[in-house]
């Protein structure tokens, strides 16, 4: 498809993929091609390069100039699907497909979740054969529209994690690399893990073994 200034461009990225606590959030941002330059002006960059305060401020600015959509996939849903032999890439692709079908872009740029870019590209292309598809590793660093999606996803996950903290207390960042998260998991007695925890994660298996 030949893209012009009026073409609708969609960026997609996720937050919380590797987390053991909390949801996986997929974010989509849709803008006309001619308006993408405004993302530079409001300070859009990969969400990992921004602290929480800056992400929140920029997220509000993105929402004023673009259409956006978030898909929240709770921990217990991830577990249910994985227990039915649906892997994390497939779970995430389902969420991306939902965003694409809702937003109907002319072109879609995605931070590739597969080790093989071509294989992932073909999966996304099947969703809409008439759509231009770009799937690259580190697309969130290369394309501003994907950076914007990464900010939207990360801010929503931050919000979801805060809701979790209000109910369950200090859970850290939710990632296995966070000592505070591991310490929280170790306080859970008799392996009665609440639904905010991804029980199918290797982290939980290791903790369960260590407390036996």
Swiss-Prot record:
Manganese or magnesium. Binds 1 divalent metal ion per monomer in the absence of substrate. May bind a second metal ion after substrate binding. It is found in: Cytoplasm. A divalent metal cation binds at residues 13-14, 111. The keyword Hydrolase applies. Its EC number is 3.1.26.4. It catalyses: Endonucleolytic cleavage to 5'-phosphomonoester. Its cofactor is Mn(2+); Mg(2+). Keywords: Cytoplasm, Endonuclease, Hydrolase, Manganese, Metal-binding, Nuclease. The keyword Nuclease applies. SUPFAM superfamilies: Ribonuclease H-like. Endonuclease that specifically degrades the RNA of RNA-DNA hybrids. Belongs to the RNase HII family. This is Ribonuclease HII. The lineage of its organism: Archaea, Methanobacteriati, Methanobacteriota, Methanomada group, Methanobacteria.
């Amino acid at each position: 498809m030949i893209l012009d200034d009026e073409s609708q461009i969609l960026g997609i990225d996720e937050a919380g993929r590797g987390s053991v606590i909390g949801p996986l959030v997929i974010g989509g941002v849709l803008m006309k091609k001619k308006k993408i330059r405004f993302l530079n002006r409001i300070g859009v960059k990969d969400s990992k390069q921004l602290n929480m305060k800056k992400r929140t401020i920029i997220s509000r600015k993105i929402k004023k100039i673009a259409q956006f959509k978030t898909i929240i996939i709770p921990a217990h849903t991830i577990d249910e699907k994985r227990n039915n032999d649906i892997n994390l890439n497939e779970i995430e692709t389902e969420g991306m497909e939902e965003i694409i079908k809702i937003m109907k872009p002319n072109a879609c740029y995605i931070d590739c979740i597969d080790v093989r870019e071509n294989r992932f590209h073909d999966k996304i292309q099947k969703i809409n054969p008439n759509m231009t598809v770009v799937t690259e590793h580190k697309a969130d660093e290369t394309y501003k529209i994907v950076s914007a999606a990464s900010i939207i996803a990360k801010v929503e996950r931050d919000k979801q994690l805060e809701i979790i903290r209000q109910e369950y207390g200090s859970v850290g960042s939710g990632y296995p690399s966070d000592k505070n998260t591991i310490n929280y998991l170790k306080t859970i007695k008799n392996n009665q893990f609440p639904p905010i925890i991804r029980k199918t994660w290797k982290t939980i298996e290791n903790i369960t073994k260590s407390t036996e």
